Amino acid sequence: MGASQKNQELIGGLILFSAALLAIVVNNSPLASYYAMLETINVKLGIENLVIDKNLMHWINDGLMAIYFLYIGLEIKREIIVGTLSKLSNIITPAIAAFAGLAMPSLIYLSINHDIKVINGWAIPSATDIAFTLGILALLGTRVPAKLKLLVITIAIFDDIAAIAIIAIFYTKSLSLLSLSLGTLFILAMIICNRIFKINRSSVYVVLGFFAWFCTIKSGVHATLAGFTTALCIPFRENDKDSPANFMEDSLHPWIIYFILPVFAFANAGISFSGISFSILFEPITLGIIWGLFVGKQLGIFSILAVFKKLKWFKLGESFSNLQLYGISLLCGIGFTMSLFIGVLAFNDTHLLNAIKIGVVVGSVLSGFFGYIVLRFIVTNPS
């Protein structure tokens, strides 16, 4: 990771944090009525019967986040072809660690929440916000070796793959087979353009990807799946910076960290304290998310990394101390934007959403703070 990209990740993390803080301030000020317009102003896209009519909040969650998952898909494709995921030996341990880091928070959440009304939130504490995590890693500078950062990114990639699968399988509320079939045809068209006709014009995939996204929204499947599958269809050429996948990934990166994620954070992190008592911190859904993110994530990921290192099944782990592995396991508990996103998909009750937001913010802050402390002050030999 070059110096300029490190600066981008650092600045992006600070902007993301500032956007979330601003949302909370605005939603608890005289400007709260303007913040509420995110859910009252509707925007239409389409013609005649082919129309998507959603409020601004949904456009952010269904539109901008689809672009974010397009970017994630491009990253994953690159890593599979030429990066760390291209070698099986490099991915087994991070993949298992990511799965454990998904399962443990979910089990903790379910052990605390038995009410059928809130069980649907089991996946909320299972996510990792890679943007925030990279921002903290950038703050730590040379205290975190490049290989250790790569391990965090690899775990986060598998976490993202799991999140996409969870959203597609568990948070699809209704299904139109006709729209889904049409969306699939546009995906197939992109594959044909790539594999058979060898078309390298990015605009072709942008247009076909847009129609795939449109059909996916109309089908009831969440639009992020269209963004991810579109990315997998876009041509990638090794050592060719001008190939569509490389070009789009490089072009999207600043938009993701400086605009899309901050806008998402601002739109979804605005906790309103009006009518909320301190007791909301001790509600089962809030506690399930806090303990899932702060305890479940670190327990699931660190236990796998430490055990595999001890058994010498994790060669890369031999370069790191257990404290370093524990520090990054803590950082993976920063769920923030991804956890908020799943929370919005799972519930629409205002009180539950406020409890979710508080749980996500507290759990993420605890994970980020203690992860930073461990890696910055407790680890004595970062080399």
Swiss-Prot record:
GO terms for biological process: regulation of pH. One of its GO terms (molecular function) is sodium:proton antiporter activity. InterPro entries: Na/H_antiporter_dom_sf, NhaA. The keyword Cell membrane applies. Pfam families: Na_H_antiport_1. It catalyses: Na(+)(in) + 2 H(+)(out) = Na(+)(out) + 2 H(+)(in). The chain crosses the membrane at residues 10-30, 56-76, 91-111, 121-141, 150-170, 174-194, 206-226, 254-274, 289-308, 327-347, 355-375. Keywords: Antiport, Cell inner membrane, Cell membrane, Ion transport, Membrane, Sodium, Sodium transport, Transmembrane, Transmembrane helix, Transport. It is found in: Cell inner membrane. It is a multi-pass membrane protein. GO terms for cellular component: plasma membrane. Belongs to the NhaA Na(+)/H(+) (TC 2.A.33) antiporter family. Na(+)/H(+) antiporter that extrudes sodium in exchange for external protons. This is Na(+)/H(+) antiporter NhaA. It comes from Francisella tularensis subsp. holarctica (strain LVS).
